[in-house]
Design a protein with these regions (language model features):
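N-terminal J-domain/J-like co-chaperone modules of DnaJ/Hsp40 proteins
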Residues: 1-40
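J-domain helical core
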Residues: 21-37, 50-75
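Short, surface-exposed loop/turn segments at secondary-structure junctions
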Residues: 42-50
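Short, charge-rich amphipathic alpha-helices with coiled-coil/heptad character
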Residues: 76-81
Length: 81
């Protein structure tokens, strides 16, 4: 399954809750970026480079949203709408 099909909480393997384990979020973020960062795909096809960029951007957006309490609460409201 593509990460792009997961909600932000699912990407990091955490429950959609207001209080989250920030250390786990940080650790998982670094792991995901080490796997999907576009720099890892320098010798890949243009399609693979494009997909890596999309996935990396999605991971960044997810991380930035979940690391901020106000944005996290807003996101929880969005996905439970």
């Amino acid at each position: 399954m593509s990460l792009l099909n997961l909600n932000y909480f699912e990407i990091f393997g955490i429950e959609a809750e207001i209080i989250i384990d920030i250390e786990h979020l940080n650790s998982k973020y670094l792991t995901l970026q080490s796997e999907f960062h576009p720099d890892k795909f320098v010798n890949a096809s243009n399609l693979e480079k494009s997909m890596a960029t999309r996935v990396s951007t999605y991971i960044n957006d997810a991380y930035n949203t979940l690391s901020d309490l106000v944005e996290r609460v807003d996101y929880i409201l969005q996905i439970n709408n």
